[in-house]
Amino acid sequence: MKIAVMGMGVAGSYLMARLKNSEHEVVGYERMPTERHDSICAWGTIKEELTNFCKKTGRNFDDFLIHDGKEMHVKMNDNVKFDIGLKGLCTYNKLGLIKDFIKDCNVIYGKAPR
C-alpha cells in the first residue's frame, strides 16, 4: 500500500517512524523547505505519553528530555503569586525528536503532494 503522511510535526514524524520498516511504501511531505523545517508550537508534553511513543519506535524519551517539571511558580499582573504542583509535565527537545523520528525516512520538503 502507498501511504502519504502530511506534515512532519510530532504526529506525522511519529507515524513515519512507526511505518518505517513496514511492507508499505511511505512518503512524508513537509510544506517547509528543509532549512526552515521547525517546530512552532508548545514544547511541553505529558512525559508518560511521549515515553510510550518513544518505546514503540525504539527510542528513549529521556534522551530528549530537557526539564521534568515538579512545580510551576506563577506570578500574576497584580503581583499575586502562587505555585502549582505538576505531575508528568515536562519540556523536551521537540525538533530533535521529530528529526530523529524521520531520519532515514523518505520525506519530501517544500512541496505539496500531487
Regions found by a protein language model. Give the residues of each.
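Glycine-rich FAD pyrophosphate-binding loop
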Residues: 4-6, 14-40
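Helix N-cap / beta->alpha transition motif
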Residues: 7, 42-47, 85, 93
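Residue-level detector of family-conserved "landmark" positions at structurally sensitive sites
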Residues: 29, 64, 108-110
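N-terminal FAD cofactor-binding segment of flavoenzymes
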Residues: 31-73
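Conserved N-terminal helical subregion
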Residues: 55-59, 68-114
